[in-house]
Amino acid sequence: MSKKLNDQELVRLDKLNRLIESKQNPYEVTKVANTHNTKSLKEKYDQFSKEQLAEMQLDKPITVSGRVILIRRTFILIQDFHSELQLYINKNKQPDLFKYFNDYLDLGDVVCATGKPMKTNTNELSLDLESLKIISKSLRVPPEKFHGIADEEIRSRKRYLDLVYNKESKERFVYRSKIIAAMRQYFNENGFLEVETPFLHAQIGGAAAKPFVTRYNALDRDYYLRIAPELPLKKLIVGSFEKIYEIGKCFRNEGMDSTHNPEFTSVETYVAYVDYIYMMELTEAIIKYIAKAIGISHTNIKNETIDWNKPFKRIKMTELVKQETGIDFTQVKKIDQALDLAKKHKVHVKEHEKTIGHIINLFFEEFCEKKLVEPTFVTHHPVEISPLSKLDYSDPRYTERFELFAFGKELANGFSELNDPIDQRQRFEKQLEEKQKGNDEASEMDEDFLEALENGLPPTGGLGIGVDRLVMMLTGTTSIRDILFFPHVREE
C-alpha cells in the first residue's frame, strides 16, 4: 500500500500477511462454487420452521458468498447484490473455525461461507457454518456505520463504498438500469432501429452549448466531443432510414450543479413523415411506458408530487408568459418595445439576445419555468432560439417545437425538423452573427449537413430526452450526482 497506514490498517495488513504465511492467501482464489445467493437461499428455506430446518437433510451443504458488514460475537452479517444473510459460528462445535474468525476476519472482507440453514431464537434465517474462507481481504477500514454514508462528497468520490453501505443508493442505480432497458424495449417493440453515430465531431452542432475540444493527431486538427447527435441522425433519415434512435453520452463544457453534469446520457429519436405533435405523443408514451415497466406511478420531490398516469399538459410559450406576467408578446412587434418590457421587469438581456424571440424566452425562463411541476409541453418557441426547427407557417415568428418540463426542469426537447436547406443556411448565418456578438453556444455553419439537406430530408419529427433527468424525476432524486455512478467532482 502506497500511503502511510494508520493503526487499524496495519492490523489488517498483518492479518493478510499471516493468511499468506499459513497458505491461505485470499487472492489465490479464482472462482467460487456458490450454490445460492442470499435471495435464493431465503426464498427456498425461509418458509420452514426452526424445527423443520433442524431435521432437514441436505444433499450437499449450502455455499454463499458476500461482504462482511457486521460482526457481533458469534454472528456475522454478509451482503451480496441481492440482500443480507446472517452467519452463525457454533464455537463449541467449530473451535478451529471460531479461531479463524477471531484471528483474521474484519468488516469489509469478502467471504465464502458453507453450512446448513437454521433459524435463531428470533426466527431469523441464518447459515450454521461448517466452513468460512476469506476470498478478498479489505485492507481499508469501512465507514463506521454500516447502514450508510452521510457525506455526499464521499459518496460521489467513492461510489463503491456508497453502493455497499447505502441500500437506497444501490436501488436507485438498479432503477436507472431498468429505465434504460425499458426505454430500449419500447423503441425496439415499436419498430425503431438503434443506431450509433460518432462521439467526435468536426464541427459544433445539434444544440446550443460549449464543447470540449480535443486534438485529432491523425488528421492534424481539432475535433469536438459531441454536444448532441442530432445532425448525424438526420443524415440517416436522408439516407432512407425512417425510425431510428440512439442512447449515448453527450458532452457540454459547462457548469456543474444539482441537475447538470458535463458528461450526460441522452436518447434522441427521429421519425420520417411525422410532425412535432406526433413527437409529443411519442414522448408521453415513452415516459408512461417506462414508469409502468418499473412500477412507479407517482414521484414526490420537495413536497411536490407528479402522477405519471395523468395526461401531460400542453401550452404555447407566449400563452404561458402571458399567464404569469400579463404580457402578450404576440402583440409586441418592435424590439424597442420588448427591451422596454425587459427593463421594466428586471430581465437582463445580453447583446446577442436583443431580439423579440430571445426576450420571450428570457421571460419564460425567469417567470414560468420553475412553476411547471406537472409534466407540461411548452410549444411554439420563437424562431430565434430554434435554429433547427421547422417554422410554424401560420405565424413564422414561431416554430413547431416543444419542450417537456416537470418539477420545474426541462426533460425533453423536440420539433418538426427544419428540412428546407435554404432556410437552414439562413438560420446558420444568424447563429454566426450571434457568435460574433458573444454567444459562445451558437451553432457554426455546417456545409456537410446542408449538403445532406439539399439531397432531400423528408418531413421528420425529432426528439431528445435527458436520460439522467428522467431517472432523477422517476426516482424522486434531487441531485444528478446520486444517479451517476461516477459523477465529475472537483479535485480534493
From Swiss-Prot:
Co-factor(s): Mg(2+)
Localisation per UniProt entry: Cytoplasm
UniProt source species: Mycoplasmoides gallisepticum (strain R(low / passage 15 / clone 2))
An example Gene Ontology CC term for this record: cytosol
Keywords on record: Aminoacyl-tRNA synthetase, ATP-binding, Cytoplasm, Ligase, Magnesium, Metal-binding, Nucleotide-binding, Protein biosynthesis
Gene3D superfamilies in UniProt: Bira Bifunctional Protein, Domain 2 (3.30.930.10), Nucleic acid-binding proteins (2.40.50.140)
Name by which UniProt lists this protein: Lysine--tRNA ligase
Subunit composition and interactions: Homodimer.
Binding of Mg(2+) 2, residues: E410
UniProt-listed Enzyme Commission number(s): 6.1.1.6
Family recorded in the similarity comment: Belongs to the class-II aminoacyl-tRNA synthetase family.
GO BP terms in the entry: lysyl-tRNA aminoacylation
InterPro entries found in the cross-reference section: Aa-tRNA-synt_II, aa-tRNA-synth_II, aa-tRNA-synth_II/BPL/LPL, Lys-tRNA-ligase_II, Lys-tRNA-ligase_II_N, Lys-tRNA-synth_II_C, NA-bd_OB-fold, NA-bd_OB_tRNA
Molecular function via GO: ATP binding; lysine-tRNA ligase activity; magnesium ion binding; tRNA binding
Cofactor note: Binds 3 Mg(2+) ions per subunit.
Annotated residues for binding of Mg(2+) 1: E403, E410
Main subcellular localisation: cytoplasm
Catalytic activity: tRNA(Lys) + L-lysine + ATP = L-lysyl-tRNA(Lys) + AMP + diphosphate
